[in-house]
Each structure stands twice: as C-alpha cells, then as structure tokens.
Amino acid sequence: MGKDTIADLLTSIRNADMNKKGTVRVVSTNITENIVKILLREGFIESVRKHQESNRYFLVSTLRHQRRKTRKGIYRTRTFLKRISRPGLRIYANYQGIPKVLGGMGIAILSTSRGIMTDREARLNRIGGEVLCYIW
C-alpha cells in the first residue's frame, strides 16, 4: 500500500488553517512542489521555501490568513481543500468536462500530459486530465 502525498499535503494545509498555524511543513516531491507553486500563484499561500533535513527535503509554506470585515465584526475566512481523484478511484475529465468550482471562484488542480495545472489553464490549452483536488 502506497502513500498518498497529495492527500497528506491537503490535510496538512487544512489542519494548519483550522488551528491558525502560520507555517506548514510537508515532504517535497515533484507533485507536491507543483501543487504548492499553483497555490502560491493563486494566492492561497504567501511564501514557500525548500528545507533540507538529514538527506530529506521539505517544503515550508507560510499560509495566508484572510480577514473579512462586516457590520458584525471581523471574521477569518477559511480555505477549503478537497481531494477528488484518489488512488482507489481515479477521476478523469476532458477539457469540456472540467468542472468549475463555485462557478469559477475556486480552482481545480489537474494532472495533464503537460504537467500539473489549474482548470483555467487546462481549458485554455484545450487538454483534459486527472482531477486532483478542488480549492475554494
């Protein structure tokens, strides 16, 4: 039985966000590096650095905690992450069937033949792939 590094990454970010932690440390693989780069580009993460500890590499990410102000006061927005395609049930979509998360407000991350990219990039390039996760 193998490890699901994508699920570990999403769970670490979700747990740190719920506990209001500033940083998250996850094991660095090619897939996790590409997903974290997308999260950084889309504004869900403030910064990322690579850290080496006894011949193993880790990604240390600083989370972005957004605060919204309403008439009733200030509240903190949460980042929702959901794993879609998993090792036991792979989910694929062609470019016409790529789902829009919250009507375009969120993003879907896909693994395509041209690398890991967001749903918008995959639609522009007219390629489909495996739907890895939703983030909103």
Curated annotation (Swiss-Prot):
One of the primary rRNA binding proteins, it binds directly to 16S rRNA central domain where it helps coordinate assembly of the platform of the 30S subunit. It comes from Sorghum bicolor (Sorghum). SUPFAM superfamilies: Ribosomal protein S8. It holds the Pfam family Ribosomal_S8. Gene3D superfamilies: 3.30.1370.30, 3.30.1490.10. GO terms for molecular function: rRNA binding; structural constituent of ribosome. Part of the 30S ribosomal subunit. One of its GO terms (cellular component) is ribonucleoprotein complex. The keyword Hydrolase does not apply. The lineage of its organism: Eukaryota, Viridiplantae, Streptophyta, Embryophyta, Tracheophyta. Keywords: Chloroplast, Plastid, Ribonucleoprotein, Ribosomal protein, RNA-binding, rRNA-binding. The gene is rps8. It comes from the Eukaryota. It is found in: Plastid, Chloroplast. One of its GO terms (biological process) is translation. Its main location: plastid. This is Small ribosomal subunit protein uS8c.
